[in-house]
Amino acid sequence: MVQADPAGAGGLKRRLGLFDAVTIGLGAMIGAGIFAALAPAAGAAGSGLLPALAGAAVVAYCNATSSARLAARYPASGGTYVYGRERLGAFWGYLAGWGFVVGKTASCAAMALTVGLYVWPGQAHAVAAAAVVALTAVNYAGVRKSAWLTRALVAVVLAVLTVVVTVCLTSRAADPVRLDPGAGATAGGVLQAAGLLFFAFAGYARIATLGEEVRDPARTIPRAVPVALGITLVVYAAVAVAALAVLGPTRLAGAAAPLAEAVRAAGTPELVPLVRAGAAAAALGSLLALILGVSRTTLAMARDRHLPAVLAAVHPRFHVPHRAELAVGAVVAVLAATADVRAAIGFSSFGVLAYYAVANAAALTLTAAEHRPPRAIPVIGLAGCLVLAFALPATAVVAGAAVLAAGAAAYGVRAARGSA
């Protein structure tokens, strides 16, 4: 059984309650889905965007349930890296952790670039790198400050999205005919869109990876995960309906800033600056929570010597994995200077779907005494993760599989040397 290190012995300090955990998950999910994944998903699914959203939500719910039960059983930082290791063996835990770290590092770059593209399109890469540096400093100063800032960002974003949905759905430009999922949608396109939209739902992983910093994790994590996921699904569905109603799938797919285009089409161009500000706030919230979660999984893997042991240090004053956070921040800052947003989303989705496939497989091994979920939930989650992963664009599948294979090969080399 995994034991969380006590805060006074090199471990992390339990500061987060239910509301903090929910807002960290919301901050990670809402920014990613609404402002980054909606347009490419519409491009893949066309008029089948809403069924794709529903499919992604089903898989996300199964993953969330499996993750919550496992997190209650193993309340240590690392998420599925820990669950896979304890339930399936060291290799599967390592593979899950590797998929999470590389996939979510790509997510960080995508969110940083989203900030840059909305704040200052002509200097997007510079703004993205600056955002990474600033938020890494916030996380370094302590997770409690991160939780408060995330709470403020979530409130701003939800207010902006409420305005967008209201304006679009009450506009004369809204046409319910555009919501018909039967016009030109294909099964392959819907599955690919679901895989891209899954990128948006994956924020609840941040709640599980904060296992050592949540008060009463056995109760808090299983409650926080479905609450955050449910709120996010309602928000996504409302925004997707509003955007489709005024733009239609073709125009939505081609929009560089789809929600800004939606309010313009609804006859309220004066709201475009507000939407751009909301997009930047959403992406900042996602980036803040992403850096937080990736650094905690890096910490867990470093403790087990699957990553350099120097990254396992916890700051004696701030009680955060400061070296892991600085390393993650440095890598993301470099990627933000070179990455393409849409390619990063596909790559990230593949890695994170692999991560949750391991989580569902691990949940299948829980006993009734360990509060095992109904068997259908991890089975559907596992199958759904595999189907959506290989339905992604070919470049994302090839790149993601290659990186996972490289990680597996590195593990094999270490095992052969007797150090795995």
Regions found by a protein language model. Give the residues of each.
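Membrane-interface "cap" regions at the ends of multi-pass membrane proteins
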Residues: 1-37, 44-48, 60-61, 65, ...
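TM-loop-TM module centered on a large, flexible mid-protein loop between adjacent transmembrane helices
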Residues: 82-83, 89, 121, 226-291, ...
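Membrane-interface loop-to-helix entry segments
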Residues: 116, 123-174, 181-187, 225-229, ...
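Helix-loop-helix junctions that connect adjacent transmembrane segments
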Residues: 2-12, 50, 54, 151-277, ...
